[in-house]
Regions:
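Acyltransferase
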Residues: 63-109
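Surface "functional belts" at beta-alpha junctions
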Residues: 1-68, 95, 100-101, 105
Length: 109
């Protein structure tokens, strides 16, 4: 879970072997969030958005882990070994939500 402010998180669910179960999504977390998955067994949450969700998802197991260069290097090596390369000429970042421009209501001068 990545903190997206308020009670919203960017999240994706994985099984115990690290295989994705869902697509990446933005979720507003409440007591009913992920109920189908939580009913199936231990539900582990971690990331910058997990701590703020721990009280609402009281049956979830909160694990304190942080991303590391070592973990990223392992993923990069696996992709490299498998020939999984991005075509940088056509690469576009993945933005989960559209950017919305707003004007400030505060007067600077």
């Amino acid at each position: 879970m990545v903190d997206a402010r308020r009670m919203e998180v960017y999240t994706q669910l994985f099984d115990a072997q690290g295989q994705p179960l869902t697509e990446v999504s933005a979720e507003v977390v409440d007591a009913g969030s992920f109920s189908t998955w939580r009913a199936k067994g231990p539900f582990v949450i971690f990331g910058s958005g997990a701590a703020k969700c721990a009280d609402v998802l009281s049956d979830a197991v909160l694990v304190h882990v942080a991303p590391s260069a070592r973990g990223l290097a392992r993923l990069a090596q696996t992709a490299f070994d498998g020939g999984d390369f991005a075509d940088l000429a056509y690469f576009e970042p993945f933005y989960l939500k559209d950017f919305v421009v707003t004007t400030s209501r505060k007067k600077l001068f």
